[in-house]
Amino acid sequence: MKLKNIVNYLKEVGIDVELKGDDSINVDQVSGLVEAQQNHISFLSDSKRIHELETTSAGVVLIHPKFESLTTTTCLLVENPYFAFAKVSQLLNPENFPAGIHASAVVDDSAKIAESAWIGENVVIGKRVTIGDNCYIGPGSVVLDDSVIGQKTRLVANVTVMHNCIIGEEGYLDPGCVIGGQGFGFANEQGEWHKIPQIGRVVIGDRVFVGVNANIHRGAINDTVIESNCIIDSLVHIAHNVSIGYGSAIASQVGFAGSTAVGKYCVFAGQAGINGHISIADKSYFAAKSGVTHTIKESGSYSGFPAIPTPEWQKNMVRSKGLNKMAQKIKHLEKELQELKSKLEND
């Protein structure tokens, strides 16, 4: 693809871009600065990697204007090189698929399947399901009764969408994820567990990514809700009645207990654990392995177990490294105190 076509595309998607160099260069693929070849486009978004810019073989580099003077390579000047790189990668790596229904698929007659959608090998589509325009339902996936899949959403393979769930537009669900499984709801009577039917739904907004083997449980009574523009990594567990606010990011192995309300633009690093029946303020960030045991009322960064403001946690970590010396010092002081006490008593 000619570089000038890439420039035009970036402008079409709302990115301000200035070309410095030859717009007739052919670009075939994206690449990192180190691995790039002459027909590749790469990017620089971190000043720590400037040395890679100096030696790259990339034909084109996406960079911030402040780095323009550091290279003689043809470059595209943009405010957010990483975002521009993502859009160029989408352009050069389109996910094309045919339209139609594979012969091995089992589709109920009452389902409404858009003509532009693809229903793949061994897919099962239940009663009254709606599949929108340009959807891709990959091999082995199951969409059960009364569920809705919005247009341009992709179920890669072996994805399970249980009954009466709603998935918005332009979603991306990786293999093995389960949407709408039974919530962990049981009542105990005299030592015996009795299942509570989970009659809520899972409602997922637009442009939501759900990673490999992630699980989002349906609500017990109210819906489990994932608002638009969220990204959910592999092996995440979201329990019944949880709500995740717009634009939040959840890394691998994070677990949410039931009925927790998460605000907008929150970030959860790997293996964070979130207690049930609490609320979390907008724009809260939780470090890896944080244990969120209580409601978070103020935006900010939190770490540790139980999670506390990160600056406070860092101070505690510094102090904890000296605990052994402190214990020895206290023991020594106690000994001196006892000796002084004995001396006073003898006097």
UniProtKB/Swiss-Prot annotation:
Q: Which GO terms describe its cellular component?
A: membrane
The cross-references to SUPFAM superfamilies, in alphabetical order and at most eight, read: Trimeric LpxA-like enzymes
Which reaction(s) does its UniProt entry say it catalyses? a UDP-3-O-[(3R)-3-hydroxyacyl]-alpha-D-glucosamine + a (3R)-hydroxyacyl-[ACP] = a UDP-2-N,3-O-bis[(3R)-3-hydroxyacyl]-alpha-D-glucosamine + holo-[ACP] + H(+)
Annotated metabolic or biological route of this protein: Bacterial outer membrane biogenesis; LPS lipid A biosynthesis
Q: Which Pfam families match?
A: Hexapep, LpxD
Keywords annotated in UniProt: Acyltransferase, Lipid A biosynthesis, Lipid biosynthesis, Lipid metabolism, Repeat, Transferase
E.C. number(s) listed in UniProt: 2.3.1.191
Which residues of this protein are catalytic?
H240 (proton acceptor)
Name the Gene Ontology molecular function terms of this record. N-acyltransferase activity
| UniProt GO BP | lipid A biosynthetic process
> Which Gene3D superfamilies does UniProt cross-reference here?
1.20.5.170, Hexapeptide repeat proteins, MurE/MurF, N-terminal domain
Provide the function of this protein.
Catalyzes the N-acylation of UDP-3-O-acylglucosamine using 3-hydroxyacyl-ACP as the acyl donor. Is involved in the biosynthesis of lipid A, a phosphorylated glycolipid that anchors the lipopolysaccharide to the outer membrane of the cell.
Task: State the family named in the UniProt similarity comment for this chain.
Answer: Belongs to the transferase hexapeptide repeat family. LpxD subfamily.
| Annotated NCBIfam families | lipid_A_lpxD, PRK00892.1
Cite the record's note on assembly. Answer: Homotrimer.
Q: What is this protein called?
A: UDP-3-O-acylglucosamine N-acyltransferase
